[in-house]
From Swiss-Prot:
InterPro entries: Ald_DH/histidinol_DH (IPR016161), Ald_DH_C (IPR016163), Ald_DH_N (IPR016162), Aldehyde_DH_dom (IPR015590), Aldehyde_DH_NAD(P) (IPR012394). It catalyses: 4'-apo-beta-carotenal + NAD(+) + H2O = neurosporaxanthin + NADH + 2 H(+). Keywords: Carotenoid biosynthesis, NAD, Oxidoreductase. One of its GO terms (cellular component) is cytoplasm. The keyword Oxidoreductase applies. It is an enzyme of class 1 (oxidoreductase). This is Beta-apo-4'-carotenal oxygenase.
Length: 533
């Protein structure tokens, strides 16, 4: 379905002097406590769901205008994706928000009604990126609404049509005192960062993410950073090469490769490297029978600056282009391109491409592949592994990443119910599904001590009485089942607890079954003796 012709308002920067009032209103709304009401949150989420439906044509037209993103991807990866995310939050919010009773307590504290209340953090700032300008702004908003927070949203100025379409949608359908959109560039972002927030959610580059984190640290503001990295793909000789090529090709053409989780390079066993490259060419032809440039499905690079950044990588590489290579600045078009390299110093290996280009680096062994990947970027946002089970398990064991995908290209980050996040310098924190709710929630431990219990709490009051402490310790302190060398020891106490059925699998039910067997065995033995007599 093609994006409809829709008029989108010209990009309008929020006046700097208006920003403090916008933030103050959001804080005042949170302070009114109305967002803590679960029904209020559900109403806002339902309104957002239908707003996405009603503004779908506008949002898809904006995506076409900003990224030349086709209707298929706009619907599948942006608008419809967020609608499903909304429904998941709506359908599960009561469960997510339910107070948890704590049960793993010493018996002496079991009457104190320990529980964990899920409380909203407060007023949050959501700063979005340009690559998925709808999904990666509104998915965090779904979590913030579900958690009971108010939010100020700062979309990317690099996708101005999407920013204006979202501003109109959000401020016309949601509670304007609770949710607002601030548009602009660096000055407006700086002004927002001068405000006090209860959490900041940022999706974008590591360079800007570090600036956000440093500024947030000045006021001890927690942040969730979704960044990126030089993500590796591993292809061993035991992999299904045709499948690996097809799925990795998809990972580099979706949104023209402007995906933070897409692979930057492929470490392929040198014995199958040529075959893998041939399968890449077949996959390319299958996806673009008339060439990538003529395809209505392939997006374009967001702007000339990023086009030239990617072009520079291809211009300066010492490697061999084995697929693609065509570029057209007038259209911001870069053909899906694979470059065969033999040096870690090659520009293709030194920078995150964030586009439809990637390098292929042949390796002798999986040992070498893992060594290279850990050297290039120890904590990437994603890794993709194609091989047999022992190989993929080893890759998971010996390399850290925000997420990982076996036999596919970053699909671990495509499902709205599954936590998504980075690790190390590829990001902090996670969101989506329940993780989105948790991301904007404070888990508040509450205890409630009955007034009548004071007679049993003499142990904590001065003057202290050692005999009372020893008595308490006998009731509350558990004994270790291991010695000083860390070896588990099964002494007499273990066997006593085993036969009583406590602390073992099955618990009381297991104990009853064991004792029934013992008793039945006893009576059967007695019966047999009586028969023989």
């Amino acid at each position: 379905m093609a994006a409809s012709k829709v008029e989108i308002a010209p990009f309008e920067v929020t006046p700097l002097d208006a920003i403090p009032a916008v933030c103050s209103t959001a804080r005042a709304t949170f302070a009114s406590h109305k967002t803590k009401n679960l029904q209020w949150r559900l109403v806002q989420l339902r309104k957002l769901y239908w707003a996405l439906d009603d503004f779908k044509a506008s949002l898809m037209a904006a995506l076409q205008q900003d990224l030349r993103k086709g209707g298929y991807e706009s619907d599948f990866t942006e608008v419809d994706w967020v609608k499903n995310d909304c429904l998941h939050m709506i359908n599960n919010l009561e469960t997510f928000a339910k107070t948890e009773k704590l049960k793993d307590l010493p018996v002496t504290y079991s009457m104190m009604n320990f529980r964990v209340k899920k409380e909203p953090l407060g007023t949050v700032l959501i700063i979005g990126p340009y690559n998925f300008p709808i999904q990666l702004v509104l998915a965090p908003l779904v979590g913030a609404i579900g958690a009971g927070c108010t939010a100020v949203i700062k979309p990317s100025e690099l996708t101005p049509a999407c920013a204006m379409a979202m501003k109109e949608m959000i401020e016309s359908r949601l509670d304007r005192d609770a949710f607002a959109v601030v548009n602009g560039g660096v000055p407006e972002t700086n002004a927002l960062m001068e405000e006090k927030w209860d959490k900041i959610m940022f999706t974008g580059s590591a360079q800007v993410g570090s600036i956000i984190a440093r500024k947030a640290a000045e006021t001890l503001t927690p942040v969730c950073l979704e960044l990126g990295g030089r993500n590796p793909a591993f292809v061993t000789k035991k992999a299904n090469l045709a499948l690996a090529a097809r799925r990795l090709m998809w990972g580099k053409v979706l949104n023209a490769g402007q995906v933070c989780m897409s692979h930057n390079y492929v470490l392929v066993d040198k014995d199958v490297a040529d075959t893998f490259i041939e399968f890449l060419k077949i996959a390319y032809k299958d996806m673009f029978p008339n060439g990538a440039k003529a395809s209505p499905d392939l997006s374009r690079i967001v702007n000339a600056r990023h086009f030239n950044r990617i072009k520079k990588m291809l211009d300066e590489t010492k490697g061999k282009i084995v697929m693609g290579g065509e570029m057209d600045e007038s259209e911001l078009y870069i053909e899906p391109t694979a470059v065969l390299v033999d040096s870690l110093d090659d520009p293709m290996m030194q920078e995150e491409s964030f586009g439809p280009i990637f390098s292929i680096y042949p390796v002798d062994t999986l040992d070498q592949a893992l060594s290279i990947a850990n050297n290039v970027h120890r904590t990437p946002l994603a890794l993709m592994a194609f091989g047999d089970k022992s190989e993929t398990n080893r890759i998971l064991d010996e390399m850290t990443s925000g997420g990982a995908c076996i036999n596919d290209s970053y699909f671990h980050g495509a499902v709205h119910t599954v936590p998504f996040g980075g690790v190390g310098d590829s990001g902090w924190g996670a969101y989506r599904g329940k993780a989105s709710f948790d991301n904007f929630t404070h888990f508040r431990t509450v205890s409630e001590t009955p007034t009548w219990m004071d007679r049993f709490l003499r142990v904590r009051y001065m003057p202290y009485d050692w005999s009372e402490l020893r008595l308490l310790q006998r009731w509350t302190n558990k004994k270790p089942n291991f010695d000083r060398q860390g070896t588990v020891a099964k002494g007499s106490e273990y066997w006593m607890w085993y036969f009583l059925g406590l602390g073992t699998k099955g618990g009381v039910k297991g104990a009853l079954m064991r004792w029934l067997v013992v008793v039945a065995g006893y009576y059967l033995s007695a019966y047999m003796k009586a028969r023989r007599a």
